[in-house]
Amino acid sequence: MEKNCGSGQSKLKALRMHIYFEVDFQEQAQHYQAVLHSRGVTVDLQPIEKLNARFLRLNPDLALCVDENGLWLSANGMKMQPDWKAEIPRLKRASLKSEMIARACQLGEKPVLVDATAGLGHDSLLMAYLGAQIQLVERHPILFTLLEDSKAQAQRDPFLSQFMDRIQLIFADSASYLKQLDQEEKTVDVVYLDPMFPQRDQNQQAIKKQAQVKKQMQLLHLLLPEDGEMDLGGHLLELAKKVAKRVIVKRPRHAIFLANQEPAHQWQGDACRFDAYFQ
């Protein structure tokens, strides 16, 4: 069951988006149009003859498209979706012992965990597979709808469907959601933060150049511009510490501490690290 806290789109500007689709997928396109409209997005339906690579190259503006694999975000000749099914090989290799994130979040204890920076949901997918009960919070209506579509597809997959009931999608602003938990005197075991735009290191060198970011993230950055409505996640740290026994922050290995707050403990990997803050 998905939850709508009513604040998902409150701080976002009015959104308008095209949905491109071939005639065979008109019904699905109309469904997505209705869902997005209910979340404050104006959607223009654009039936086209052939949704292929050539069409995407000739229509580089940010848009949505629908095909036999569901809803996609497209721009600059590329298209992407969270695609949880593509994560299955990674999940099958994963274990509580092999995954650093499992040690950081104590997944062996099957925690109740709020992922306050949803992104594409891949880390939450892994954590749910390893036993956590996930509250996946996302405020952007288009990204939330993409996540919702990925979960719906996962529920029809023999492997993924085994643990989809451990993931609850929540359409809300993360700060508002954490404040609500605090006001209601509710606590969770873990709050997980993975800011999409990590702060730069002390030398002001970008952690990753845009050209090196994989396709999915390139398109996500177009949808959620760093200098627009999205932030670096620092303000979430204090809110998270009020409602969780343990706050885990994923960072590029050489990034500065989130909100310049030194963690109580760290787990270091080759490319990233996990900073822990305890209540």
Curated annotation (Swiss-Prot):
EC category: transferase
GO molecular function: rRNA (guanine-N2-)-methyltransferase activity
CDD domains in the cross-refs: AdoMet_MTases (cd02440)
EC number: 2.1.1.242
Family that this chain belongs to: Belongs to the methyltransferase superfamily. RsmJ family.
Function: Specifically methylates the guanosine in position 1516 of 16S rRNA.
Protein's name according to its UniProt entry: Ribosomal RNA small subunit methyltransferase J
Taxonomic source organism: Acinetobacter baumannii (strain SDF)
Lineage: Bacteria, Pseudomonadati, Pseudomonadota, Gammaproteobacteria, Moraxellales
